[in-house]
Amino acid sequence: MRGKLILEDGSSYTGELLDGNAKTVGEVVFTTTMTGYQESLTDPSFCGQILTMTYPLIGNYGTAAKFMQSRRPFVRGFVIGELCDAPNNWQSEKSLIDFLTQNKVPCLYNVDTRAVTRHIRAAGSMKGVIVSDGTEPDEIAALQAEELPRDLVAMVTTPEVYVMETDQEDAPHIAALDFGVKRSILENINRLGAKITVLPAYTSAEEVLALNPDGIFLSNGPGDPQDVPEIVAEIQKMAGKKPIFGICLGHQLLALAFGAKTYKMKFGHRGGNQPVKNLRMNRVHISAQNHGYAVDPASLEGTPLVITHTNVNDDTVEGLRHTSLPIFSVQYHPEAAPGPDDNMYLFDEFWALMKGE
């Protein structure tokens, strides 16, 4: 069935609906990653959003359980060019069509995603709806008027504490606050030789410190960091008690905890090819990113935080370090999935802080 994506500024893009009855509303964003569509669909950082893939052919290698980054897809919709109906890969367990259908993800395909992307780049990310061609105007208007949820972290965090053990002797114990963490991040930390206790996002500082971890990890996640002031308050209580490493949303929350400010970007950074300059090393690394908010560099004046990394494309803040405490953060995902692994050295830095080096 024919369908369309209608943005809040009135622009409209036609395509085919995978499920003719599907309709949805969300913030329309795009990612430039060429592969890793299943990882993107199941990345909790995309919660509440309609995801547009810029690469023209999606689904050609199918899907598999091993590529899941969370318990289910959290996107509100999926907009793509060509949808492959005959995947071919030795790891494939089911087609992308079956995956989207079984998980009830509204998908609009055969869309001019280049046009969608160019419009978002020019006008900025905005609210949009996916509907079938026959949808009544009143129904479209009601969908467009729907208020999107704000505390997205509460929707994606783990409901209970769980532990990832390791066989390595003298392994550090890391308390990971789950704001929407990707499975690959935890698996990489665990594989490096760490016991991880994964905690719900709203765990109190007292409960975290009662575990006596060697370090605290603040994960990635969706939404506006200013929508979760309770978490910021708990981070303030933990500062100086244990080494802390934050990524993505965790990076933004750390900045807020020390008095800096964040702002909404025009269209964000989403993809596996963002160049980041490490100012201390004077080297550029390619990073995987998924965020629509950033730390305001002007607001760092008077705080104990210094900029350690910047984005080569737009000079936005990509990394921070505390001047006296064992605390640092980056705006991107060090382990990628999908994307490059140029930045795995950051975990080595975290290990060094936990050892007091």
Per-segment meaning from a language model:
Residues 171-175, 195, 243, 286, ...:
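Residues that mark the start of a beta-strand
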Residues 319-356:
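A glycine-centered loop/beta-turn motif at secondary-structure junctions
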Residues 106, 173, 243-245, 261, ...:
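Proline-centered loop/turn at the N-terminus of a beta-strand
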Residues 34, 290-295, 331-339:
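Glycine-rich phosphate/pyrophosphate-binding beta-alpha loops
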Residues 283-325:
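Catalytic beta-strand/loop cores that center a nucleophilic Ser/Cys/Thr
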Residues 1-206, 210-211, 225, 337, ...:
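RNA-binding accessory domains that recognize and position tRNA/RNA substrates
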Residues 215, 220-286, 294, 339-353:
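Cysteine-nucleophile active-site neighborhood
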Residues 168-174, 281-284, 322-327:
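Beta-strand-turn-beta hairpins that frame and shape the catalytic cleft
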